[in-house]
Curated annotation (Swiss-Prot):
Lineage: Eukaryota, Fungi, Dikarya, Ascomycota, Saccharomycotina
Protein name in UniProt: Putative uncharacterized membrane protein YMR173W-A
Organism the protein comes from: Saccharomyces cerevisiae (strain ATCC 204508 / S288c)
Keyword Transmembrane helix in annotation: yes
Membrane topology (UniProt): Multi-pass membrane protein
Any GO CC annotation of this UniProt entry: membrane
Amino acid sequence: MTTTPTTTTHMVLITTIHMVLTTMIHMALTTMIHMAPTTMIHMALTTMIPTVLPTRRRALMVLTMTIRTAPATTMTLTVPTTMTLTVPTTMTLTVPTMTTLTVRQTRIRALTVPTMTILMALTMMIHMVLPTRRRVLMVPATTIRMVLTTMIHMVLTTMIHMALTTMIPTVLPTRRRALMVLTMTIRTAPATTMTLTVPTMTTLTVRQTRIRALTVLLATMILTDLPITTTLTVLPTRRRVLMVPTMTILMALTMMIHMVLPTRRRVLMVPATTIRMVLTTMIPTVLLTKRRVLMVPTTMIHTAPATTMTLTVPTMTTLTVPLIETRTPMGLPTTVHPTMMTLMVHLIEAVVINTVVTTITKFLDVFDKKNILLCLDLSMKILCMSCGYVSAGK
């Protein structure tokens, strides 16, 4: 397998197989596994070259600067700049900000290699991948005044002294399910619950085989002084996954629209176009088929066929994924930011839902700003009832 890195100007790439990977700025990289590309960059920034080290049942990845020798079961990953990595397919991880990853998934095990970009140029992320028999634990850490404490199967705690973001992905694949958790400054959580905070623009796609498919698509943007928290609730049932995102925007942001085209055994992701919006709320619609989950959460999106899903997620996002299988959906979240001004929903299901959308629009016209939160709460409950779900909101 070959990789083609995208580097900055005045960069000289030297790749040597079965040798040593070295990087500039007084840093030496030594990798004792199979392949070792080399990167030299004229400027202070460092571009990472991925090395894919497939073994019999897992694929290891070594992307680095300032990496130390690691055993075969441990991987250290540092991704500071733009990078594109491709490892043949079943699960696709795409980070539209700076990095695009395509990672292969084999049977029960899920190998997930996320990449991070930080607000400052010379901030490095170090990821340690500890694959075990049925799970992969990933613990990245920044190098700027940060203390990272990791407890396997328990809690990931991060303390950052500066206004930098740290993402801690955790992949806990079960027999038929793979869950991904990215966290920043998370608190103690039970083993059956995970919290996902994505402070940068990120798109995740976790594709499952057989009947159950868990798909998490996130596209977020950092707001200057007023970060917005958005809640995504994934409620896996016996043969379906309910994804309920609720979005808020404080300022005119550029949105990424991701179109997921699920086929029988693969998920194709096509991030495209941008939309400028001000204070827009998106209400998703879950369109369940026999073996397929279709989601239509939207603002200003066009009608799509039944096999196409369009998801727009604009802001700081928090994802809670219960690990225990739930047969009964728990409904839509009802927490909406009070500063929302506009609710624009384009739903492609039946006339009933279209009528609900019209009702929501009338609600927003009648009530003033102070009552918008109440309107949205009621609107989502109406959507729940029209879609056949029971709302868990108050």
